[in-house]
């Protein structure tokens, strides 16, 4: 309205007609202004009347009512903030409800005031203001997450080996596991401040701590501090945790102690963290199971508000490097799909096509940047963990070096250093004289105590007592083992080494207790006996674990045997299946082998391919050998040649059979049974002939091979003659030889120089015996020339004689049985005849000399 009035003032002129018109306009404007003012005054009056009426109904003054209404939005904001922070709804109701009640002067005035003041527009405006403030606060809180993580890492020296991005990832993991981001990040920060290390386990630890703290109401810092003690000393830390929270057992502590004593610090820390985490999870579960209906409803309400506020806080929280990479990949994929869809579209102009390409390139560059960021973050996480491990190791060895230095200091050096320290403090006025005197006296007393020689133990255990105690302890140990074996006689029952150690310790303590009743114990024995209960308790725990380990090893061994047996059966079934399909045994065996190899190397495809390739090469070589008939011939001949040239074994066997035959025939002759010297002699001669023929055949084949080789080399004639001579020598042709089979007019055999061959008719006419007598002394080939007399022939046959035995047996037996004298006579005669025959056949031309074949 002011603007028209201003225009009116400016437009006034001295024209009367126009002046009247302008005055009319002024009146209309002022009348409108008056009406507007009256309306405004009426609204204000009505508002004041309503406020006065509401204040009157509430029983308070208008000023008190206005002050209470001004404070109401701020109190609503406090209620929303406290609910989001995880406080109990009942506690918030008591706090904020009491403040609202006090603002209105009581419960009834409060409800009357709220009923009169809360209108729909006011509720909307208030809700909008509260929502805006909450969003602004949430954005600020979420945006400061990384800053808070960095502060925590810096102030803790980053002993956990984490980065802010890694802490953000772990908090997101807790949020995905059902916790809120704030709960997980709070417990994670507390663990980092407590010095908890072990990046692989800190995720599960932080979630367990958050759940336990939420369910029990115990402060997160106290639980995190308990985990921090595990990092310093797993055994003592776990013991302290058991005393404070009662969530781990003595068996778990003993197992951790065993690992730590064996030098496995990392394994001990991991086992301690796992035991503590499991213990807190069990306690959390029991707490929730034992909640009443009201507590359960309150817990669900609180978790609902926490989840709602946590979702609001996500607005300002930064993304992790991995989340940024995922979003960048999605954005690039979307831009690339749009470009591929629009680049060849006829209805898209060049400007739009260029814009689509620019969007794709921007998305690609953003993706590359996100990938580099993710790689850098991964490397930073590794470097942080490595730096943490290095720093922890340095700190550990620094502490050990300091302790070692203190141990290496002599008492005098320690006393001198303490004196200098106290004197300097007194000189600088940093210590009171009375305190100086007390500390100096204590240092002097400690030094003087080190100068006193410790008294030697006056009790000495004799060698006999020690030997007796040792034998007694061994006896008790074996008795305990025997009792256990009698109780557990199953095939799968095994006794662990830890159980045997327990028996040994129990036996030693039993012997010490018995010895204490009959003699005085040494200081060492008293010390052992004083720690009996603790030692045996640890031994029992170790024995129980050792039995479990032994039993599990047995189960594992049986499982491996079962797997091996199953593999064998599958291979057999594969062979059976192959035979059922009509394959040969060799093919079935190959399929079974393939099945065994697949079962054995199935987990490693590369190794399976290698062994299958080598096996197939072997099968190919076997198939090639099976088709090579020449190789079979050579192999058969080589084996037969080895057997034929093994003269020692053959002659040994022949000699054994010969002497056995002589003994059997002699026994048969002496006992009156039927004996067959002819068959025996024939079998002996057959064996000897077979041996000689085998050797001759080997020689012939070898000579023929040499002859063929010589012929190929150009010396066929000479080599052929050499081969024939060698063959003749093998068949003893130097002594006359065999002319071979065939007709009368067919060429056969070989005749030496100076020899001749009898025809078949002449041989029959002269007689074989006479011919042999003619050949005695002439290498069985006969002498070609003027024949000599029979006497000459006999004289030339040296060492040859014929014997005719006339035996007359006078049997002096009774009842038709041969008598002793007759038996002896027959035995002597047979013995003499056998000796003479053997001597004859061993001469030139005899059967044993190679002649007479």
UniProtKB/Swiss-Prot annotation:
Keywords: Coiled coil, Viral genome ejection through host cell envelope, Viral long flexible tail ejection system, Viral penetration into host cytoplasm, Viral release from host cell, Viral tail assembly, Viral tail protein, Virion, Virus entry into host cell
Source superkingdom: Viruses
Pfam families in the record: Tape_meas_lam_C, TMP_2
Protein localization: Virion
Biased composition (Low complexity): 376-387
Region (Disordered) location: 370-393
Principal subcellular localization: virion
Modifications the protein undergoes after translation, according to the UniProt entry: Cleaved into mature protein H* by an unidentified protease.
GO biological process: symbiont genome ejection through host cell envelope, long flexible tail mechanism; viral tail assembly
Coiled-coil spans in chain: 360-387, 548-568
One cellular component (GO) term of this entry: virus tail
Family membership: Belongs to the Lambdavirus tape measure protein family.
Function: Serves as a ruler that controls the length of tail by stopping the tail tube polymerization and is probably released from the tail shaft during infection to facilitate DNA translocation into the host cell. Assembles into a multimeric linear form possibly stabilized by the covering tail assembly proteins G and GT. Its C-terminus fixes the tail tip complex (J, I, L, K), thereby forming the tail assembly initiator complex. Tail tube proteins polymerize around tape measure protein, displacing the tail assembly protein G and GT.
Subunit structure: Interacts with the tail initiator complex presumably through its C-terminus domain. Interacts with the tail assembly protein G. Interacts with the tail assembly protein GT.
The protein's name: Tape measure protein
Species in which this protein is naturally found: Escherichia phage lambda
């Amino acid at each position: 309205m002011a603007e028209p009035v201003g225009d009116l003032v400016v437009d006034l002129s001295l024209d009367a007609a126009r002046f009247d018109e302008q005055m009319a306009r002024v009146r209309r404007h002022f009348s409108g202004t008056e009406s507007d003012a009256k309306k405004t005054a009426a609204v204000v009056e009505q508002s004041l009347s309503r406020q006065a009426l509401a204040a009157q109904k509430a029983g308070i003054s208008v000023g008190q009512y206005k002050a209470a209404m001004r404070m109401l939005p701020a109190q609503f904001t406090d209620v929303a903030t406290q609910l989001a922070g995880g406080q109990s709804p009942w506690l918030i109701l008591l706090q904020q409800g009491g403040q609202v009640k006090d603002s209105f002067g009581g419960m009834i005035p409060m409800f009357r005031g709220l009923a009169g003041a809360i209108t729909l527009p006011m509720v909307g405006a208030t809700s909008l203001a509260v929502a805006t403030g909450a969003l602004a606060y949430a954005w600020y809180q979420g945006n400061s997450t990384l800053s808070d993580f960095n502060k925590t890492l810096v102030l803790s020296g980053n002993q956990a080996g984490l980065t802010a991005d890694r802490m953000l990832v772990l908090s997101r993991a807790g949020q995905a596991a059902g916790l809120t981001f704030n709960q997980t990040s709070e417990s994670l920060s507390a663990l980092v401040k407590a010095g908890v290390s072990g990046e692989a386990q800190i995720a599960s630890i932080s979630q367990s701590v958050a759940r336990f703290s939420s369910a029990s109401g115990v402060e997160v810092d106290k639980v995190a501090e308990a985990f921090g003690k595990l990092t310093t000393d797993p055994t003592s830390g776990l013991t302290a945790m058991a005393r404070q929270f009662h969530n781990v057992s003595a068996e778990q502590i003993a197992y951790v102690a065993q690992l730590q004593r064996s030098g496995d610090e990392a394994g001990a820390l991991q086992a301690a963290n796992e035991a503590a985490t499991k213990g807190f999870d069990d306690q959390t579960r029991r707490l929730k199971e034992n909640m009443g209906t009201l507590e359960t409803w309150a817990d669900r309400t609180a978790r609902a508000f926490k989840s709602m506020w946590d979702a609001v806080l996500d607005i300002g929280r930064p993304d992790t490097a991995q989340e940024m990479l995922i979003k960048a990949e999605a954005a690039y994929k979307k831009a690339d799909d749009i470009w591929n869809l629009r680049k060849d579209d006829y209805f898209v102009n060049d400007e739009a096509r260029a814009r689509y390409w620019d969007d794709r390139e921007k998305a690609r560059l953003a993706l590359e940047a996100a990938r580099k960021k993710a790689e850098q973050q991964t490397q930073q996480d590794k470097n942080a963990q490595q730096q943490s491990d290095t720093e922890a190791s340095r700190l550990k060895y620094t502490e050990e070096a300091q302790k070692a230095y203190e141990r290496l200091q002599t008492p005098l050096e320690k006393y001198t250093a303490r004196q200098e320290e106290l004197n300097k403090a007194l000189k600088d006025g940093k210590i009171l004289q009375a305190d100086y005197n007390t500390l100096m006296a204590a240092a002097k007393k400690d030094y003087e105590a080190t100068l006193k020689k410790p008294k030697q133990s006056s009790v000495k255990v004799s060698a006999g007592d020690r030997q007796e105690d040792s034998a007694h302890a061994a006896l008790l140990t074996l008795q305990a083992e025997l009792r256990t074996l009698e109780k557990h006689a199953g095939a799968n029952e095994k006794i662990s080494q830890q159980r045997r150690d327990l028996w040994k310790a129990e036996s030693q303590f039993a012997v010490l207790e018995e010895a204490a009743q009959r003699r005085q114990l040494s200081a060492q024995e008293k010390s052992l006996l004083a720690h009996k209960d603790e030692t045996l308790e640890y031994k029992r725990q170790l024995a129980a674990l050792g039995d479990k380990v032994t039993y599990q090893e047995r189960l594992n061994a049986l499982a491996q045997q079962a797997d091996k047996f199953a593999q064998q059966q599958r291979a057999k079934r594969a062979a059976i299946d192959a035979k059922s399909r009509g394959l040969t045994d060799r093919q079935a065996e190959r399929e079974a082998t393939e099945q065994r190899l697949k079962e054995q190397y199935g987990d490693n495809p590369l190794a399976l391919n290698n062994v299958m390739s080598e096996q197939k090469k072997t099968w190919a070589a076997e198939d090639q050998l099976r088709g090579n008939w020449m190789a079979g011939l050579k192999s058969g001949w080589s084996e037969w040649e080895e057997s034929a040239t093994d003269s020692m074994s053959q002659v040994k066997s022949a000699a054994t059979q010969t002497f056995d035959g002589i003994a059997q025939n002699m026994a048969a002759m002496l006992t009156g049974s039927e004996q067959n010297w002819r068959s025996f002699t024939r079998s002996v001669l057959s064996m000897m002939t077979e041996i000689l023929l085998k050797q001759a055949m080997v020689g012939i084949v070898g000579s023929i091979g040499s002859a063929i080789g010589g012929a190929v080399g150009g010396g066929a004639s000479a080599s052929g003659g050499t081969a024939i001579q060698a063959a003749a020598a093998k068949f003893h042709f130097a002594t006359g030889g065999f002319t071979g089979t065939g007709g009368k007019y067919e060429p056969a055999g070989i005749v030496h120089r100076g020899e001749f061959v009898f025809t078949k008719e002449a041989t029959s006419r002269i007689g074989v015996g006479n011919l042999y007598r003619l050949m005695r002394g002439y290498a069985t080939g006969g002498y070609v020339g003027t024949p000599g007399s029979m006497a000459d022939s006999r004289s030339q046959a040296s060492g040859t004689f014929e014997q005719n035995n006339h035996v007359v047996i006078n049997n002096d037996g009774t009842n038709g049985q041969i008598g002793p004298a007759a038996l002896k006579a027959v035995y002597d005669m047979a013995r003499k005849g056998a000796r003479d025959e053997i001597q004859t056949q061993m001469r030139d031309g005899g059967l044993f000399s190679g002649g007479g074949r």
